[in-house]
A protein has these predicted regions:
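Soluble FAD-dependent oxygen oxidases
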Residues: 1-461
Length: 461
């Protein structure tokens, strides 16, 4: 078969195809992580499934490497590729809510904010992350942790169905009864098996929540982390609360007298009656020293989801590392605090996201996501707007991770991997599910067409 020409491909596309000579090329190819700069040969800006199929067929016939962009929030820049084809689905943002069935169908270009906007008017939400600019596609396929995780599970646990374009250009549906093996692999296996063009989610009742951040001086961090560690297992699952080592942002609306201080924070969300949330948090706060400030209060759920957006715009320098954590002994807490004191910038941070509760009620082999017994998913992120500090934030992150990794469980969250997602790391992450994922890759993508990702290589690639 003769390979599709560029002219034919462009003619087959409803959306624009952006090339290097085009005026908007640099703007379109730019990535969320300003530390990463890639130069694709072409960018296919898909508007529908037919555009995605045309892009896959063109790339396959012309032996082009492809990268898949959904919401465009990928940390290691895996949504782009040098000298290949970026299949950009960021314009495919449709959201349809079925309030009777409590389900949501979302396009692959949607961000969490897009989904929250559509669901909130019905008093519903899909469990997702903590920043509204996060793309729902990569979040779901890699796992998805956030404020609702303890009560309702991972984002991927709430995926009911997906429409997928395979490497050969076929379109299939994956759910419990149709292509069930692919449905299994999509829930945690990343973008290894195809391009998801439609996600069907289970949504849950969420409207106004009792939520917000509480900050303490880092001198109190040991006590805060100890009491938080001891409190969490007995806390109701309606409480989603993560602990972080951060810096009070040097900007309004944060109190001027505390701006720039190294801090320990608990950012919490209680999805239930406000009085119940206040009572639950009081049981934790009464054990702790007085905070620098406590901004917990009633707010619409989307307001909580977007609270941190202004601090993390597109284009910052990012380097992150993560681990799963089962226990948090005092020695680990001390190691965390020692590293956090030397944070290279005001934006650099460490967060421990709880992944107990509902996550543990799913079997280890029920989805590709294998980690069902951990307590937290940890991320360490070196962040700064200045490109000259890229090396410094990277070194700090790696050093911090090396200091606390001995206290971690096996593997890490694939959405928190950068350049550390090699075969051994992925095998540790997927555990007993890894061989099954390789077999699935052999079936659905035997040539490793989809390889610009945290890659599970087929057996004979």
């Amino acid at each position: 078969m003769q390979a599709m020409s560029t002219e034919t491909f462009i003619g087959n596309m409803r959306g624009p195809v952006v090339r290097r000579m085009d005026a908007d090329y640099d703007a379109v190819r730019s990535l969320y992580n300003g530390m990463i700069d890639k130069s694709p040969m072409m960018i296919a800006r898909c508007t529908d499934v037919a555009d995605v199929v045309a892009s896959v067929n063109f790339a396959r016939q012309n032996d082009l490497q492809v990268a898949i962009r959904g919401g465009g929030h990928n940390g290691p820049g895996l949504g782009s590729v040098d000298n290949g084809l970026m299949i950009d689905m960021s314009m495919m943002k449709g959201v349809r809510v079925n309030p009777t069935a409590c389900t949501v169908r979302a396009g692959p270009g949607c961000t969490q904010g897009d989904v929250d906007h559509a669901t909130h008017i019905y008093g519903l939400a899909v469990p997702a992350g903590i920043v509204s600019t996060t793309g729902i596609a990569g979040l779901t396929l890699g796992g998805g942790t956030g404020y609702l995780t303890r009560k309702h599970g991972l984002t991927t646990d709430n995926l009911l169905e997906a429409d997928v374009v395979l490497a050969d250009g076929r379109i299939v549906t994956a759910n419990k009864s149709e292509n069930a093996d692919l449905y299994w692999g999509l829930r945690g296996g990343g973008g290894n098996f195809g391009i998801v063009t439609s996600f069907l989610f289970q949504a849950h009742p969420v409207n106004v929540v009792y939520a917000g951040p509480v900050f303490w001086d880092i001198e109190d961090a040991r006590t805060i982390m100890q009491k938080y560690r001891d409190f969490l297992p007995g806390a109701p699952e309606e409480l989603g609360a993560f602990v972080g080592l951060k810096t009070v942002p040097p900007m309004a609306p944060f109190p001027a007298e505390h701006q720039g201080k190294r801090a320990c924070a608990v950012i919490a969300c209680y999805n239930g009656p406000t009085g119940d949330g206040q009572a639950v948090m009081a049981k934790l706060l009464e054990k702790l020293p007085p905070p620098l400030f406590n901004w917990m209060g009633e707010m619409p759920y989307p307001a909580l989801q977007s609270m941190f957006d202004p601090f993390f715009p597109k284009g910052l320098q990012w380097y992150w590392r993560g681990d799963f954590v089962n226990e948090l002994p005092d020695e680990a807490i001390d190691a965390h605090i020692a590293q956090a004191r030397n944070a290279p910038s005001a934006l650099s941070l460490m967060h421990l996201y709880p992944i107990d509760g509902a996550v543990r009620r799913v079997g280890k082999s029920d989805t590709a996501w294998n980690t069902r017994n951990a307590t937290w998913s940890m991320v360490i992120a070196g962040i700064d707007p200045n490109p000259q500090k890229a090396g410094e934030v990277t070194r700090w992150t790696k050093g911090y991770w090396e200091a606390v990794h001995p206290y971690s469980a096996d593997g890490g969250y694939v959405n928190f991997m950068m350049d550390d997602g090699d075969d051994s790391r992925l095998k540790a992450t997927y555990g007993d599910n890894y061989d099954r994922l390789v077999a699935l890759k052999d079936k659905y993508d035997p040539t490793n067409f989809f390889r610009v990702n945290q890659n599970i290589r087929p057996l004979h690639s």
